Design a protein with these regions (language model features):
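A short, flexible loop at the N-terminus of ABC-type nucleotide-binding domains that lies
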Residues: 1-8, 12-24, 31, 57, ...
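Conserved ABC ATPase signature
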Residues: 126-130, 134
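ABC ATPase nucleotide-binding domains
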Residues: 226-270
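Helix-to-loop junction immediately C-terminal to a conserved catalytic motif
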Residues: 53
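H-loop (His-switch) and adjacent beta-strand-loop-beta switch element
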Residues: 200-213
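The feature captures the beta-strand-to-loop junction immediately N-terminal to the Walker
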Residues: 38-40
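Catalytic Walker B motif of ABC-type/P-loop ATPase nucleotide-binding domains
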Residues: 151-155
Length: 270
């Protein structure tokens, strides 16, 4: 069995021929690893996810996926009044079949998945009554019970409060380390990527990118260039464990500049 889950070779994609979102992109996603995709808005992160799940086709190059994919979008709405358990059970649709009822084993597996994301107590709650963050956790559980080999997550912590961000990041790490799943995630949070990712891809726009080991490429220099904001990479010990993280630096001068820019935009809009 290959130790590579996804191979990206000379990959290119454009929406119009003179503006490439991706160009000559080379990357490898290791089986059982976490792969983070970072970049400002509009740099092609979602486009790359669409290529990975087969919703779009490359303009050039190739992309080889070895295994079944479960996709968790950034936002998810339900058209009918399903419970949280019903929504999560839909992940078992391929196993259950079109006209069959879920077995006891299906329900137990789904409740277990909900429990892993802290949502077992909400199993009978209507999905539409859950908060945005709670709905996202249910969809994570749905992806888990699909028994896919690769989870593709579009900004998995964007709708979550701080407690549930930590929960989801812990679960992402556990799904890779303990369950052997491959996880591909987009994120706007470099510290999240540094915490859980083995490898990363920085999308800098117009086909420019940087790929490699997360610890090697998530540097102050590369991230300052990417986000045009001052950042500091920090290392410290917490409960006997060495921790590395990345924090934005918001100085009094920068705060004043942001307030000034905001006021100028407001005046222009008026």
């Amino acid at each position: 069995v290959s130790d590579t889950a996804i191979s990206i070779s000379d990959l290119g994609y454009f929406y119009r021929p003179d503006v490439w979102v991706l160009r000559h992109c080379e990357a490898r996603v290791a089986r059982g690893g976490v792969f983070a995709i970072l970049g400002p808005n509009g740099r092609g992160k979602t486009t790359l996810l669409h290529l990975l799940i087969g919703a779009s086709k490359p303009r050039e190059g190739s992309l080889a996926v070895r295994g079944r994919i479960a996709f968790v979008p950034q936002l998810f709405e339900a058209s009918f009044d399903y419970t949280a358990l019903d929504m999560a059970l839909m992940g078992r649709a391929r196993k259950i079949g079109l006209f069959s009822q879920p077995s006891r084993a299906d329900v137990e597996a789904t409740l277990s998945a909900l429990d892993r994301f802290g949502m077992a107590d909400f199993a009978e709650r209507p999905f539409g009554e859950l908060s945005g963050g709670q709905r996202q956790l249910v969809i994570f559980a749905r992806a888990l019970v699909a028994e896919a080999d690769i989870l593709v997550l579009d900004e998995p912590t964007s709708a979550l409060d701080l407690e549930n961000q930590a929960l989801v990041l812990e679960r992402i790490a556990a799904l890779a380390r303990e369950d052997g799943l491959t996880v591909v995630m987009t994120t706007h949070q470099p510290h999240h990527a540094l915490a859980v990712a083995d490898d990363a891809l920085l999308m800098r726009g117009e086909g420019d990118y940087l790929a490699g080991k997360a610890r090697d490429i998530l540097t102050e220099e590369s991230l300052r260039s990417l986000y045009r904001a001052p950042l500091k990479r920090l290392a410290f010990e917490h409960e006997g464990v060495e921790v590395e993280t990345i924090a934005p630096i918001l100085t009094p001068t920068r705060r004043a500049n942001i307030r000034s820019q905001t006021a100028t935009k407001a005046e222009g809009a008026a």
